[in-house]
Amino acid sequence: MSSQELVTLNVGGKIFTTRFSTIKQFPASRLARMLDGRDQEFKMVGGQIFVDRDGDLFSFILDFLRTHQLLLPTEFSDYLRLQREALFYELRSLVDLLNPYLLQPRPALVEVHFLSRNTQAFFRVFGSCSKTIEMLTGRITVFTEQPSAPTWNGNFFPPQMTLLPLPPQRPSYHDLVFQCGSDSTTDNQTGVRYVSIKPDNRKLANGTNVLGLLIDTLLKEGFHLVSTRTVSSEDKTECYSFERIKSPEVLITNETPKPETIIIPEQSQIKK
């Protein structure tokens, strides 16, 4: 086949047309083997080579094949997924090029919304990382007072209150809610909700005390308080924002990138 001939790829439903010479820029890649018929995973369907991969990310890969440069939007964040695609196509230099971006520290964010109303306190915790919310869910226990059945032993004894442990509610993977303080039960009796946060064994009903313990827990997990504000002037909900800089868990080490491969931020390009 002539290097000037065109090839059409269907990658995840997106159509790309390029030259054979572009695909063969990296002879050791799976894309080059695809043209030689040496890789059976790529099938010819209706005159197009079908590839069951991410079409949106392939546009960056094809641009890299054409220019030996990686041009990414300023808001791009899917470095791990893009590197996974580069590994699939066995584009070693692109894999190496993405490594520094995977090694950059990324902040984990937490927001604590706190509302104190009369003798009740309400908490809602948002987290950018679901694992942080899972950690807090495993540590926080809400205890509700439940009256036990009255006992008879010649004389009547009033029902005793027992504590029923409950986990905080999880509206989504990224938040949890709970409350403490007085609690109106279904029989119009007033009980109390207590909150315990491991490893502290205390059962606290005062909202301010629970807030202090929750903040202390986040600080011990490496978070830093970055701001406080009032979310709503009507109900005076307080918001405490925390941040933790932590390297990503998935780290891949490869050879040094080739000197001819560079990343150019999109905003630095001159649009034609």
Swiss-Prot record:
Gene3D superfamilies assigned to the protein according to its UniProt record, in alphabetical order: Potassium Channel Kv1.1, Chain A
Main localization (coarse): endoplasmic reticulum
UniProt entry tagged with the keyword Lipoprotein: no
Keywords, sorted A to Z: Endoplasmic reticulum
S-S bridge residues: none
Location in or out of the cell: Endoplasmic reticulum
A GO CC term assigned to this protein in UniProt: endoplasmic reticulum
Residue ranges of domain BTB in the record: 5-106
GO molecular function annotations of the record: identical protein binding
GO BP annotation list: negative regulation of delayed rectifier potassium channel activity; protein homooligomerization
Signal peptide residue numbers: none
Pfam families assigned: BTB_2 (PF02214)
Tissues of expression: Ubiquitous in normal tissues and expressed in some tumor tissues.
InterPro entries linked to this entry: BTB/POZ_dom, SKP1/BTB/POZ_sf, T1-type_BTB
The keyword Endoplasmic reticulum appears for this protein: yes
Organism domain of life: Eukaryota
Its biological purpose: Inhibits potassium fluxes in cells. May regulate Kv1 family channel proteins by retaining a fraction of channels in endomembranes.
Oligomer status and interactors: Can form homooligomers. Interacts with KCNA1 (via cytoplasmic N-terminal domain) and KCNA4.
Identification of the protein by name: Potassium channel regulatory protein
